[in-house]
Amino acid sequence: MIKNELNQKLQLTCIVCALLSGTNYLHANGKWSDRHEKGIIPTVKKLTEEGIHINGTVRDSQGEPLSGVNIVIKGQTIGTTTDIDGNYFLEVPSRSSVLVFTYIGFEEQEIVVGNQININLNMHEISTGLNEVVVVGYGSQKRASIVGSITTIEPQVLSQGTTRALSNNLAGNVAGVIAVQRSGEPGADGSNFWIRGISSFQGAGTSPLVLVDGIERTLDDLNPAEIESFSVLKDASASAVYGVRGANGVILVQTKRGKLGKPTVNVHFEQSFTQPTKLPQYIGSAEYLTLLNEIAKDNGQQQSPYSQETIDHYINRTDPDLYPDVNWMDLITKDFAMNQRADITVNGGSDILRYAVVGSYYGEQGIFERDKSQSWNSGTHLNKFNLRSNVDINITKTTQLTVSVGGYLQEMNKMAISSDDAFSGAFETPPFIHPAYYKEDDNIYFPVVNQRVNPYVQVTQKGYATTSQSKIESLFALEQDLKFITPGLKIKGIFSFDRYSWSGVTRSKTPDLYQPATQRDENGNLILNISSYGQQFLSTSENNDWGNKATYVELNLNYERTFGKHQVEGLFLYNQRDYQQFEESYDIVPYRRMGIAGRASYTYDNRYIAEFNFGYNGSENFAKGYRFGFFPSVAIGYLLSEEKFMEPYKDTFSKIKFRGSFGLTGNDQLDGRRFAYQTTLGEDGTGYDWGTNGQYYHRNSRFEGDFGIPNLTWETVSKTNAGFELGLWNMIDFQVDYFFEHRYNIFMKRNNIPTSAGFRNTPWANYGKVNNQGIDLALNVNKQINKDLYVGFRGSFTYAQNKIIEQDEALGVMGTNRQRTGEKVNQLFGLVDEGLFTFDDFQKDANGDYLIAENGGYVVNKDIPTHTFGPVRPGDIKYKDVNGDGVVSSLDETAIGGTYNPQIVYGFGTNFRYKNLDFNIFFQGNGMTYGFKGGCSNKFTPGETMGAMGNILTNYQDRWTVENPSQDVYYPRLTWGKARIMSETLHGGWKT
């Protein structure tokens, strides 16, 4: 399958950082004052003449000056930053003032002014990140106390990609995440991604839960500039608190919040371009017709379909209208398309109010061509605007109000047909049947062949479609410190309301279409005959509207306190969510969930850690008595590096940590089926006519639809995880995890119930079981060589393999080679090839001539199984009789290869920073992924319509022929018609 647009991109990035603030200057008279440039917001308060003037230099542990260090007077809004040489000047109100020094990647430090006037400081890098705060389920923890399998990634890494969809930046960047981008089409280019692979049957929910600021939202709605932290929860101890939503893992995203200090403004702009990484290369008309002659001869035709004179016309391009040679892929696509991204971030605040505002724009064009002579535009272009504002207000010293509002507006224009149809037309249309259009007397005429399309017409003449999307997200939270009851106790309430709307309009038309011209008249004009009349105007608009809204409520109680060497943490919360879809005036029954969750964690002497989590959740998707479930987890951890006997080796082993967990999580996404415990009724038009005397009334018939199963419940996953973390020399961080998951009660339709049971639709059941296991690892290296040079490396590797332990299969399949139990989820099935037929595989008569079968093929030897898919000849694929019945048929299909989804995903890259110049390079890839070259609908093999089914790849010469009867070729014998089936049946091993 060819992707519509692939994301090979070159990126030109311009980052402008401006610290907009009041700056203190020393006048000639010795007086200090504030000077503000025009348009710059003053934020440093004017001080009285009695203020104390402080200056100094801030350096790192190696004595190199640090530029951009934030220095704020504790409890006030007065502050400044160091210049490029690490120097600063600041006026403080009194000698009791406390200066707070903060800098990313360094430990925060506080210094009392006292009698000092010159305060110099050496800041120290944060060691191994043990004190770093990591976002976890319904809260945050220090990295040292985390015993679950959690991967975090810096927001800067996510912003290095140049596509609209944030999900495209996960593969290879985040250990444990397997992601596949199926399309590059603007607006539809997001990746499918899974945490630690797939462990449920296709159709059931396999996507992870994505929470933005604690609210269930869509990852690709975000702009990377909005993100402050990004965490992936992989094991049960990390995700059990989410109960029936945690089986597939959880992604937690926190958006940027305001920081104490003067406002900073960051402006970012980038220009990039998109081009297809690889498009199929096809042969031209002359080669095509020559090959068709060869195939005809091989099939016993005495006369070639195309004369050499005709082929010479194509070679010499004597008359391109009558003898065209069209590269349809080049005709309908551009070489590249431009993209732009721009964002602006404003961040700052005081002890009372802190704010972060992020606005962004993203524009992207598609690679399909348009007809610029049209008054309307069928070209693909997307414009997206994001805005997010997060405000934190300290109402009192113990009460904080949070108000967060965000959203986006996206407008898109594209051709009226789908991109899949556009590519399909280019794949299927040979280069010689007609040109894109005829131009006669300044008029344009579009040719087409029956049962085919004109790819150029499809892309440029069929009209256009526009879509508009908008979303508003809101969150309100109130947190109260309850230290008057006991220190470390807090209560927090959260309310969120989101609303999404989508609307689309399609304006379509069809031009007049003509039969391909075959000759010219005596005046040299093309003789054109109409094939079908179209319309010269765009059709009436077709409107579609869709949307949804979601409400979320949460109340949580948090406790965190340290008693000597003992550190305890606790969480208890209640939440509920209401989600409703609506289409035009039709409202769908809301989806509702509610539950409670809790966490208890104990750490002794920063070395030994134990944690218990649980979720008790309910879903309206099940019958009463089956709606709620309890999902517990336990985890332990041991920090060897914190032992006293390790202190002499601290410079080398900055972190050595062992951890393990076990627990249960659930999944209530049941293959799109709602209220499966209820029996449904269906209706059709095959009912009865009622009445007398010629007056009859028709009544539709009703029938039993899906049979209700009252004891259906959620899928349950037991997860086991063992992890090891190693830090070396305060610059290398290595993490590896082994995981094993057993998923049971998988929701599926029964397949072995006979039709005599009377079910119109087979009933559902919690029947399936799947095991999933693997490893994921991550390596990060960060080294500040000196004040000007920084070097970094990052890499990740994920391997996940699943196996179906139990699955309800049809009686005729169970116990045979077609059984899917024991195979991978979404395992590919097909015939097993045993090479190509040779001349020795067929019977001859007494005269030495090959025996001809009734279907036109040759008669195979008696020791070779009968092939039922069509006539066979030397050069065709020989298939294995897997079930041993002497016949090759669909009953011989068995597991071949693997799955379309990769089992291995990896990535690695390096980055250098010298002064203000950054250089980044990153590679990502996947392995153990399989697919068929073409299958039964192969578009690259000659066929029967107009002498051909589709285009032919340029590597066609690597094929079996009588002159080259090799087994080591890319293609088997090329043919057409019914015989073509034998060379296209799904199979494994033959050049896959």
Predicted regions and their residues:
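Short, small/polar-rich motifs associated with maturation and membrane association
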Residues: M1-L387, L401, G812, R873, ...
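Short solvent-exposed strand-capping/beta-turn motif centered on an Asx-Ser/Thr pair
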Residues: S61-G63, D481, G727, Q784
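Short linear motifs in exposed loops
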Residues: Q62, V69, V92, D220, ...
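Beta-strand-rich extracellular modules
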Residues: T102-F106, E479, N782
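Outer/extracellular conduits and scaffolds centered on Gram-negative outer-membrane beta-barrels
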Residues: T152, Q160-T163, W194, I198, ...
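Acidic/polar loop-and-plug regions of large Gram-negative outer-membrane beta-barrel proteins
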Residues: Q301-P324, T398, Y408, N413-E473, ...
